């Protein structure tokens, strides 16, 4: 089999369309066949007997750095798998122009010089899809596998919507090499590339964000809990869509909003808010234990699917951890932090002893999690910076050996960002100061940004990194500290009020403009401009914070869910 991606020649032209808003609906005709139409076309609408899902798309990339998408499933009577397929198809039609551009900027060229790797990867993914299909068929009443079925059908629908092939036959061999599928498994790819020994391609690095910064901050007098995440990634990934999905599965988290990308039904960052009033984020942790890669098999559920299931089904941090831990794939190994805002009483002295914050870490064959509420109220913050916290994970991942080899940069409590968070977390008093900290980078002046390098500092050693500012001719003890296509590309923040409507404040693009050593990112002057595809992106990234108001409020849903749950429990 030849697992080669096809370049989409028309993508650039399609991406230049001037239309800013699109609404697409998937429905069923009276005879049961699927149909879709663009809102406003009455002739098409009259063919429908039952609406299934509608996607509302609003493109503000050039104005705010973000596009916005809401997908609403119409009825709880629609089977899970059809909810997923209809939602995915509507999104694929509404966002296809950005999908085209994102594919060019990220996936194209991934298999160049790596045919053997992509052959093995494709066979692995086909086996994985077949295994999940078998489990779904053998367990039709199992709620977990119903959720898996919803998720994979959402992916199939997304691909079919993008290709305008409503109801087309599913071919796993074609799906497994489709660029949209590759975008879906972007996080999992980092570990799969290690397992199948992908050769390094300096011209194309496509994987998950790899590194991020995160902070959960308890304000004085329990005034609020601020919840923030900064994605670090290739600058080629900066076409962004903030999304809100509203399913009708009856689950506590059936409605959720998240920061995301074209062609991705997951966050990938990850930053997610659910109608169960859970706020969820992750920061990736490295796995340096090559022997553990043997535990990665096709008979598991990849992280991108397990996370979606946990988001929808959990009403607490513990439930999230338990759902996420099933069928651990050992890929996209992260530290996940779940804050349950239902348990937090803003401004009250007396707070629950447990249940507010839960921390989960994964490695192949290992899921470690525990409640960290007491820690949060004692220390007033929980940071995330790509180093594992739990000793079992540190040992199993061989992170302790990396500390021995390279020093404190790989340690949990002495790595630069750990020290910066420890020093600066008390500067956070409100949303604005949280954004300021999470966008901070003063690498030429901050003593905590220093390294055994020439020049003696690195723009990587900051809460919001800008590795493009490191000199090309600099010398560094390891590549992560040097010049590369890698930096902070956003910030997202929510609090106990915003989460009621699944809102968050977000800034798109790299940090810049505060000091002369960290200029505003501009493709016209960037040394990466000829090396990194960035079709459809604004040239100059100098956007203000945005708090987008969704069309529908999720707060009412959760109270209705709680009422129904109590009624059913009393029967």
Curated annotation (Swiss-Prot):
Residues 1-18 form the signal peptide. It comes from Caenorhabditis elegans. The keyword tRNA-binding does not apply. Glycans are attached at residues 62, 149, 442, 473. One of its GO terms (cellular component) is extracellular region. InterPro entries: PLipase_B-like (IPR007000). Its EC number is 3.1.1.-. Pfam families: Phospholip_B. Keywords: Glycoprotein, Hydrolase, Lipid degradation, Lipid metabolism, Lysosome, Signal. GO terms for molecular function: phospholipase activity. Belongs to the phospholipase B-like family. Putative phospholipase. This is Putative phospholipase B-like 1. It is an enzyme of class 3 (hydrolase).
């Amino acid at each position: 089999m030849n697992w080669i991606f096809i370049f989409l020649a028309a993508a650039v032209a399609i991406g230049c369309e001037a239309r800013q808003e699109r609404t697409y609906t998937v429905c069923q005709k009276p005879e049961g066949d699927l149909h879709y139409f663009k809102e406003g076309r009455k002739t098409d609408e009259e063919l429908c007997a039952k609406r299934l899902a509608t996607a509302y798309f609003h493109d503000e990339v050039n104005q705010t750095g973000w596009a916005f998408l809401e997908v609403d499933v119409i009825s709880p009577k629609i089977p899970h798998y059809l909810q997923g397929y209809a939602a995915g198809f509507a999104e694929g039609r509404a966002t296809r122009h950005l999908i085209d551009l994102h594919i060019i900027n990220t996936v194209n060229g991934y298999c160049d010089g790596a045919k053997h790797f992509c052959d093995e990867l494709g066979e692995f993914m086909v086996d994985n899809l077949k295994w999940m299909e078998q489990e779904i068929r053998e367990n039709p009443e199992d709620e977990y596998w119903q959720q898996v079925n919803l998720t994979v059908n959402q992916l199939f629908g997304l691909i079919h919507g993008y290709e305008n092939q409503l109801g087309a036959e599913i071919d796993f061999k074609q799906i497994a090499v489709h660029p949209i599928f590759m975008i879906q498994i972007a996080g999992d790819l980092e570990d799969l590339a290690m397992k199948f020994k992908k050769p390094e391609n300096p011209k194309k690095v496509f994987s998950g964000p790899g590194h991020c910064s995160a902070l959960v901050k308890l304000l004085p007098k329990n005034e609020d809990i601020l919840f923030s995440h900064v994605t670090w990634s290739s600058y080629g990934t900066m076409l962004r869509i903030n999304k809100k999905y509203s399913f009708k599965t009856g689950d506590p988290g059936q409605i959720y909003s998240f920061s995301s990308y074209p062609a991705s039904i997951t966050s990938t960052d990850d930053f997610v808010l659910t109608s169960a009033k859970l706020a969820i984020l992750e920061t990736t942790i490295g796995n340096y234990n090559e022997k553990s890669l043997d535990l990665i098999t096709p008979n598991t559920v990849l992280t991108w699917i397990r996370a979606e299931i946990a988001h929808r089904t959990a009403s607490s941090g513990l439930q999230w951890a338990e759902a996420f831990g099933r069928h651990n794939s050992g890929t996209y190994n992260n530290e996940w932090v779940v804050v349950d805002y239902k348990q937090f009483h803003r401004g009250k002295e007396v707070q629950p002893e447990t249940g507010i914050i839960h921390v989960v870490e994964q490695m192949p064959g290992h899921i470690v999690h525990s409640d960290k509420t007491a820690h949060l109220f004692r220390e007033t913050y929980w940071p995330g910076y790509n180093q594992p916290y739990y000793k079992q994970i540190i040992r199993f991942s061989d992170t302790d050996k990396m500390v021995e080899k390279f020093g404190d940069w790989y340690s949990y409590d002495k790595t630069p960002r750990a020290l910066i968070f420890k020093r600066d977390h008390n500067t956070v008093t409100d949303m604005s100061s949280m954004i300021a900290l999470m966008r901070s980078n003063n690498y030429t002046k901050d003593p905590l940004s220093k390294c055994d390098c020439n020049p003696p500092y690195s723009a990587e050693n900051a809460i919001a990194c800008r590795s493009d500012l490191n000199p090309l001719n600099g010398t560094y003890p390891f590549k992560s500290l040097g010049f590369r296509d890698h930096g902070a590309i956003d910030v997202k923040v929510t609090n106990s009020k915003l989460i009621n409507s699944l809102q968050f404040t977000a800034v798109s693009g790299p940090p810049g403009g505060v000091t002369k050593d960290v200029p505003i990112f501009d493709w016209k002057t960037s040394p990466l401009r000829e090396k990194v595809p960035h079709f459809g992106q604004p040239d100059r990234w100098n956007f203000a914070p945005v708090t987008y108001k969704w069309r529908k409020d999720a707060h009412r849903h959760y109270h209705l869910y709680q009422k129904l749950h109590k009624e059913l429990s009393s029967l």
